[in-house]
Amino acid sequence: MGNTFGRLFRVSTFGESHGGGVGVVIDGCPPRLEISQEEIQIDLDRRKPGQSRIVTPRRENDICEIISGVFDGKTLGTPIAILVRNQDARSQDYNEMAEKFRPSHADATYEAKYGIRNWKGGGRSSARETIGRVAAGAIAKKILKSVYNVEIIGYVKRIKDLEAIIDPNTVTLDEVESNIVRCPNGETAAKMIALIDQIRLDKDSIGGVVECVARNVPKGLGEPVFDKLEADLAKGMMSLPASKGFEIGSGFAGTFLTGSEHNDEYFIDNNGEIRTTSNRSGGIQGGISNGENIIIRTAFKPTATIGKEQKTVTRSGEETTLAAKGRHDPCVLPRAVPMVEAMMALVLCDHLLRFQGQCTISDRFF
């Protein structure tokens, strides 16, 4: 249970960190969409381990194989299956964790729930599960781009106490990809990289915040009450490994303002469209997109698996210590950027199909 996301654009991920491979089955993708392995690979390469000195040194090519659902470079409308094979698992590094629980990791809770767990690499709780999401997200991005020219860009906003000043309305993908930490502010990025280098040498970890903007999102996506667009975005982001917080628009900072200070006042633009003079709502009002840029932030905790010795317990209830071995990210933020983008794309694509199914058909009634 809990391995499927979405209502009409449905993705089901599978696989474990040290198993034969990981992947995704996508159901509900419209037919005749032009898509290639190379397009999907672009985002997978941004997510893969071993890409720089500030991420896990595990070496995986993460080459995707499209198993079904695509023919002659176009989607068939049938389920799309994508597989990425694991090649560089070193399960012996985890032998100690077969008995000892890693503090703040999923080891103890998986054991409590199922009575059994795959301790090699964390199994399903590993961030390798997100390979399937990123692959599906690449297809969702293509749909959104093809229909409404929607552009989704994520970037590292903050690491520990180093926060970058970034304009989400103008930031570009080239700026994000200009350095290994994926912070488009070069001066702050250099400080972030130096901090991660030091944390890695200390055998410790740090967290931070990924901000993500979706531009050109049409009005009308999202549904009242339980399926509000921001509610589904929050679910998507909070389902990512290591995520601990979600904000949209003004977020928690908005609680310091009065209503007159916080409200986004309306005006009519040169095209006769209703617009807002500010965007503290983050592009969503009443759970429905208003046509402004959707701006969200996701907080990620410090990586739980660290080389520093910490107190823990064994499966049999004995107190002990653990200094984790294995290859792990000292900071998940650089590789979390494409994961956040993917979840944004999956939510928007699913709601776009729902909007088309419910609201555009009514045009035929009049």
UniProtKB/Swiss-Prot annotation:
This reaction introduces a second double bond into the aromatic ring system. It comes from Microcystis aeruginosa (strain NIES-843 / IAM M-2473). It catalyses: 5-O-(1-carboxyvinyl)-3-phosphoshikimate = chorismate + phosphate. Its EC number is 4.2.3.5. Reduced FMN (FMNH(2)). Pfam families: Chorismate_synt (PF01264). This is Chorismate synthase. Homotetramer. FMN binds at R124, S125, S126, G286, K301, P302, T303, A304, T305, R327. NCBIfam families: aroC, PRK05382.1. Belongs to the chorismate synthase family. It comes from the Bacteria.
